[in-house]
């Protein structure tokens, strides 16, 4: 029989790539999406036109991890073999404006799913998406599975709670419940408010002449950037292990924001010249002096 997977957060970057990966693996995939007044499935719309994917193996359900009734009902109806919890309010800055909502979604959301698994079928495998923001004010570099957490935002704190409640339920109820602590992972499906997409979009506009400036913060800030397609494969592999464990998922390489800007400019054919230092450092397009 085909395996059945349930994805919370199916309309996000990771949910879209994971759906396509699992469908090509022969899974039956169910995704949970929130009701919205505007179209919010653009990342997964191409599933229906991909010749390598059987469209009748993909199903969408309305639900929300902030609502325990919908979480339980969907899991009870589908009876999945694997559940991937990718649903989250994932913006660090926004978590300071909406700390209660972030906690309700990112922390309690995981708890609601775990409680449903305990009540419905303890054999269901569970993957919880963690974040490098859980490390926060890092106590060692590089970080690994044994590095202590020191979150510096409501988002990071909520993810730490989800991490530990997953481990607690694994040990208390003998569940196959796992955590993946993901470092930054990008793709063309990444939200436009994230720095990589912000840079690409702004520089394309400058190249096309519809804009002249891009404002950034600390361009020497470094990030471990991977590709989302690779990271969803890691998620799947975690649930194929013989025993449930927790893993850090990263590229183990760091690049500065400035390096990323230079790389995008090179691909666009923009010869960038940097002048000044500190907060006054600016990059100019040599050809057009902008």
Provide a role label for each language-model segment.
Residues 1-187, 229, 235, 239, ...:
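N-terminal Rossmann-like NAD(P)+-binding domain of SDR-like oxidoreductases, especially those catalyzing
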Residues 18, 24, 31-39, 55, ...:
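C-terminal substrate-binding subdomain of Rossmann-fold SDR/epimerase-dehydratase oxidoreductases
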